[in-house]
Amino acid sequence: MKRMADKKAEPLLAKLKTDPNNSQLLNQIGMLYKATHQFKDAAGYFQKAVDADPKNVAARTDLASCLFYQGDADGAIQQLQQSLSYDPKDANSLFNLGMIRLQAKNDPHGAIAAWQQLLKLNPKLADDKKAAVQKLIAQARKPKVSE
């Protein structure tokens, strides 16, 4: 998978040599590596993208995902909170924040708060996405059964 990502990234990496601080280009390269589950490589490019453009919420949200997949939930949450400081309505950041709080931090209340904020601030969210978020909220509210 890494070899495939490296091959697809070659033309973008060539462009990057002449424009090393191009946040969009760095983000594209990060997406190639993320798609092939090369999260460490992807995180490096997403980090460079947000270094070049700190307000690049999409790159910051993708960086957070990669950090989470590498086991750094705290780093992921920090990146998502930074994203939300630039764009408090960003649905992807709010959704991911809820998932990470629930899955990595066992914080259903924090997850529900993030998802409720997502629904409140994004009234035009597609119905299927609203339904999916509402389902997650309902599941997070259910008490865990002890084994």
Whereabouts are the PLM-identified features?
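Terminal, low-structured helical/coil segments at or just beyond the last alpha-helical repeat
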Residues: 106-147
